[in-house]
Amino acid sequence: MKVKEVAQKIEPKMKKTIEAFQHEIASIRTGKATTTLLDRVKVEAYGQLMPLKQVGNIGVMDVHTLIVQVWDKSMVSATERAIRDANLGLNPSADGQNIRVSIPPLTEERRKEFVKLTKKFGEDSKVSLRNLRRDMIHDIEKLEKDKAISEDDKNRGKKEADDLLHKFEKQLSDLIALKEKEIMEV
């Protein structure tokens, strides 16, 4: 195995870390109605917890309102309760088989909490990226120890690991800044 192969093994994992971060922050409120806001909501249905999107359709009515069309009428109250209990600061109201979810404007304090949460998710992702870099360097050092590569190749490999880390940390920082701007926008 050569340095390039080690890098090709690690880079997709770093991309997945960025994608996981994007998915994680998608459910953080920004004051606008988006269907991803309800991604983490689990409904007690048929004796088990199910994701909300498996119980009904989620749609955007307008900038400040989501609508959930529950497929099974008997699940309306459980779905409404799950949305209310999800600790998202939302107050759903049932209307037949539909549930309207009004998105209240965020207070300054709540916005700051969401920014802090975004930064926490970002820091967790940076730790994952650094761990992947460490694994890459470990693999490269093992190759050198096994005499599969020269010391120069090892040093080039370490530099490549650092370059990969910087590239993905920059992407992460840009995403954090963008989400922070989105949250603080009134």
Swiss-Prot record:
InterPro entries: Ribosome_recyc_fac, Ribosome_recyc_fac_dom, RRF_sf. One of its GO terms (molecular function) is ribosomal large subunit binding. Belongs to the RRF family. It comes from Chlorobium limicola (strain DSM 245 / NBRC 103803 / 6330). GO terms for biological process: translational termination. Keywords: Cytoplasm, Protein biosynthesis. The keyword Protein biosynthesis applies. Responsible for the release of ribosomes from messenger RNA at the termination of protein biosynthesis. May increase the efficiency of translation by recycling ribosomes from one round of translation to another. It is found in: Cytoplasm. The keyword Protein biosynthesis applies. This is Ribosome-recycling factor. GO terms for cellular component: cytoplasm. It comes from the Bacteria. Pfam families: RRF.
